[in-house]
């Protein structure tokens, strides 16, 4: 397969390159693309090309992870030159002619791609889908209440640098925060609205200007869950929270079903679910650098009929972005080979 990566020098693009190698993806030719600023540099012996001016003719699959604006500008052009585009941004997820795919959940959806583009879900949605699919198949999912605990790497390298820098700056005096949240002078926040070190921010993403006071992250969770699980009427209430963790998103999920399902029954279903691993105490540190969605703390939710509560942790850079894109590419490669 002749493969391209747009955004190859970025955080997710770097992980994509690593995962292609780890999974022995059948790459016969690899081309790397990034901004004009990075063009001409070398990565693993491959010269990076300017994504905006490159000719993509001859490529079979192109993975995009360079942000929504780049995907909007280039994805259709690349698809028109013959490649199947797998896009990691939010640019195409809601488009009715673009399938939104989690490899273990709805792989059949890749076949219906009239625009030649397949979208990768948001990282928080991605973590939940392999867990919710078997539960929905068993009991009929009706509603979700979700609180997320999202790592700073979800904001890119700048988020990682901000947490690291703030932590280094104040760690020597951090004990003073025990009794007074203003006892330490934090560096001025840049990426986030408030200091992220030793703190929790109930605002992951940006407020959408539609009067609902939800963030785009919260709306992605609702819209993408409906599309992937093929439940257009699914009710979803999310609160997306940024936490001082470098990598690994976690979700507390309270789910309501149409039919009874016990905690033991759910555990049995999830034991063999693809992309899922049971864990007594799932944590982002456990998930970082790993592929599965780790799920635990499975119990009944007594506030609703047929309710379950559970906790999920997943690496937002691997399965939450790069791994799923490569897994979709594997499905496409198998199809193209016939």
From Swiss-Prot:
Domain of life (superkingdom): Bacteria
Main enzyme class: oxidoreductase
Keyword Cytoplasm: no
Keyword list, A-Z: Amino-acid biosynthesis, Diaminopimelate biosynthesis, Lysine biosynthesis, Methionine biosynthesis, NADP, Oxidoreductase, Threonine biosynthesis
PROSITE patterns: ASD
InterPro entries: Asp-semialdehyde_DH_CS, Asp_semialdehyde_DH, Asp_semialdehyde_DH_beta, NAD(P)-bd_dom_sf, Semialdehyde_DH_NAD-bd, Semialdhyde_DH_dimer_dom
Annotated pathway: Amino-acid biosynthesis; L-lysine biosynthesis via DAP pathway; (S)-tetrahydrodipicolinate from L-aspartate: step 2/4; Amino-acid biosynthesis; L-methionine biosynthesis via de novo pathway; L-homoserine from L-aspartate: step 2/3; Amino-acid biosynthesis; L-threonine biosynthesis; L-threonine from L-aspartate: step 2/5
Alphabetized GO MF terms: aspartate-semialdehyde dehydrogenase activity; NAD binding; NADP binding; protein dimerization activity
Annotated active site: 123 (acyl-thioester intermediate), 249 (proton acceptor)
Pfam family, one: Semialdhyde_dhC
Annotated substrate binding sites: 150, 242
EC number, as in UniProt: 1.2.1.11
Positions that bind NADP(+): 9-12, 37-38, 153-154, 316
One of the protein's GO biological processes: diaminopimelate biosynthetic process
Reactions it catalyzes: L-aspartate 4-semialdehyde + phosphate + NADP(+) = 4-phospho-L-aspartate + NADPH + H(+)
Protein family according to the UniProt entry: Belongs to the aspartate-semialdehyde dehydrogenase family.
Protein function: Catalyzes the NADPH-dependent formation of L-aspartate-semialdehyde (L-ASA) by the reductive dephosphorylation of L-aspartyl-4-phosphate.
Protein name: Aspartate-semialdehyde dehydrogenase
Taxonomic source organism: Streptomyces akiyoshiensis
Organism lineage string: Bacteria, Bacillati, Actinomycetota, Actinomycetes, Kitasatosporales
Gene responsible for this protein: asd
């Amino acid at each position: 397969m002749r493969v391209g990566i747009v955004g190859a020098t970025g955080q997710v693009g770097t992980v994509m390159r690593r995962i292609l190698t780890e999974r022995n993806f059948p790459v016969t030719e690899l081309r790397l693309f990034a901004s004009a600023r990075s063009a001409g540099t070398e990565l693993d012996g491959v010269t990076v090309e300017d994504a905006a001016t490159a000719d993509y003719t001859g490529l079979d699959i192109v993975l995009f992870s360079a942000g929504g604006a780049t995907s909007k500008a280039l994805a259709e052009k690349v698809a028109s030159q013959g490649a199947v585009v797998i896009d990691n941004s939010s640019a195409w997820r809601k488009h009715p002619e673009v399938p939104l795919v989690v490899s273990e959940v709805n792989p059949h959806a890749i076949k219906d791609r009239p625009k030649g583009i397949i979208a990768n879900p948001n990282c928080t949605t991605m973590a939940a889908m392999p867990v919710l699919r078997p539960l929905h198949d068993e009991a009929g999912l009706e509603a979700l209440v979700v609180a997320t605990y999202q790592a700073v790497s979800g904001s890119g390298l700048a988020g990682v640098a901000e947490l690291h820098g703030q932590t280094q700056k104040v760690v020597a005096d951090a004990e003073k925060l025990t009794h007074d949240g203003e006892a330490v002078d934090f560096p001025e926040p840049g990426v986030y609205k408030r200091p992220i070190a030793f703190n929790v921010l109930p605002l992951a993403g940006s407020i959408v200007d539609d009067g609902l006071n939800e963030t785009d992250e919260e709306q992605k969770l609702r819209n993408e869950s409906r599309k992937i699980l093929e439940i257009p009427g699914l009710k979803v209430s999310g609160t997306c929270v940024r936490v001082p963790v470098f990598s690994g998103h976690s979700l507390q999920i309270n789910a309501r079903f149409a039919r009874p399902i016990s905690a033991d029954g759910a555990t049995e279903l999830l034991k063999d679910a693809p992309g899922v691993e049971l864990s007594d105490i799932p944590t982002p540190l456990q998930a970082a650098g790993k592929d599965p969605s780790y799920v635990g703390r499975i119990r009944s939710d007594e506030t609703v009929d047929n309710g379950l509560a559970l906790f999920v942790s997943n690496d937002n850079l691997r399965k939450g972005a790069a791994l799923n894109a490569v897994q979709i590419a594997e499905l496409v490669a198998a199809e193209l080979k016939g």
